[in-house]
């Protein structure tokens, strides 16, 4: 099964965004199978804690260009959860990844969030991933709150804090767009 890393870049003044996806098969791959990108307009402004309102429509539009039945994982440059409730999964506050999971309605599709910064009150099911010589972790969470994906992220190709294919998704969203 394939995996896709999705990232976006936005030009506020022009109200344009570019959403890019890097498609790969195995966690250790050093090159993508494919790259896809779309240009979007009329996106919402960034609001802390409601990042999904800006990102979700473009991500869904990008995913319309692939056969999701051939994918088992979507990786986002974002948190899946913003707040975790110890007693109830249903009481947890959804982040971009959880909103995407709900929108897609595919129980067999895993959503992993990889964030460069910690989000307050999101420590119960967020795992730290130290890569390379970095003293700063990546923060990894998933739709399956109890599953620790930090080891698979650590196994991804690249010597630095951010795995090569994740960095490539960021770069791809800016190529011919900045």
Name every feature range the model reports, one short phrase each.
Residues 83-106:
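Short Gly/Thr/Asp-enriched flexible loops that form oxyanion-binding sites at enzyme active sites
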Residues 4-17:
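N-terminal beta1-alpha1 ligand-phosphate binding loop
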Residues 1-6, 34-50, 56-69, 73, ...:
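C-terminal binding/interaction regions
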Residues 54-61, 91-97:
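Short acidic (Asp/Glu) patches
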Residues 14-28:
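Acidic, metal-ligating active-site segments
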Residues 25-37:
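Short, compositionally biased "basic patch" segments
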């Amino acid at each position: 099964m394939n995996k896709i890393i999705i990232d976006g870049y936005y030009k506020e003044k022009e109200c344009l965004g570019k959403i890019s996806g890097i498609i790969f098969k195995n966690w250790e791959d050093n090159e993508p199978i494919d790259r896809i990108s779309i240009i979007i307009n009329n996106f919402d402004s960034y609001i802390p804690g409601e990042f999904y309102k800006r990102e979700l429509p473009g991500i869904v539009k990008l995913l319309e260009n692939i056969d999701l039945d051939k994918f088992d994982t979507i990786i986002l440059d974002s948190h899946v959860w913003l707040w975790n409730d110890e007693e109830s999964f249903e009481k947890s506050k959804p982040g971009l990844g959880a909103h995407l999971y709900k929108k897609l309605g595919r129980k067999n599709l895993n959503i992993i969030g990889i964030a460069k910064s910690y989000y307050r009150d999101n420590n119960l099911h967020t795992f730290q991933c130290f890569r390379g010589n970095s003293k700063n972790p990546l923060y990894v969470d998933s739709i399956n709150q109890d599953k620790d994906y930090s080891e698979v992220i650590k196994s991804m190709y690249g010597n630095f804090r951010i795995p090569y294919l994740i960095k490539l998704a960021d770069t791809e969203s800016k190529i011919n767009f900045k």
